[in-house]
């Protein structure tokens, strides 16, 4: 059996999939902490995706109830639902902090068992941040607070 992975049809399917992912992403790459190291940005550039032909599926002002005092920050508008954070937390760290919430187009990655992140047993190991391909999970930036001190 021969499987062709670089035919025009396969390349077009890849491009369409990336465009669909980008339609649910906030696409503010210039101001993102992952700019230059974002895997979605790299794949988009490699495939030549310069604009998204689909209407953005982000709800205006979509926010999550996330504390700004916790060292881990989550941006649901940058999350592409790859579930790497869930896998690394479950299989490597054995903490099960993250879980899938909702279904269909409302699917999101959230703290398991409908807990707040402060109530979860997160060890702050940073593995979920390291494995996040976009800026969906990142460490809290206290640069301005340090300069103000």
State the predicted function of each range.
Residues 1-124, 130, 136-149:
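Fe-S ferredoxin-like electron-transfer domains
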């Amino acid at each position: 059996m021969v499987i062709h992975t670089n035919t025009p049809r396969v390349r077009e399917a890849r491009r369409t999939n990336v465009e669909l992912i980008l339609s649910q992403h906030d696409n503010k790459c210039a101001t993102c902490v992952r700019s230059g190291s974002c895997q979605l940005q790299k794949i988009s550039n490699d495939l030549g995706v310069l604009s998204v032909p689909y209407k953005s599926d982000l709800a205006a002002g979509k926010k999550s109830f996330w504390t700004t005092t916790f060292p881990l920050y989550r941006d649901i508008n940058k999350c592409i639902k790859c579930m790497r954070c869930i896998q690394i937390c479950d299989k490597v760290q054995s903490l099960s902090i993250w879980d899938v919430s909702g279904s269909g187009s409302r699917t999101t990655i959230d703290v398991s068992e409908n807990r707040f992140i402060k109530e979860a047993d997160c060890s702050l190991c940073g593995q979920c941040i390291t494995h996040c391909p976009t800026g969906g999970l990142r460490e809290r930036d206290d640069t301005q607070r340090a300069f103000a001190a």
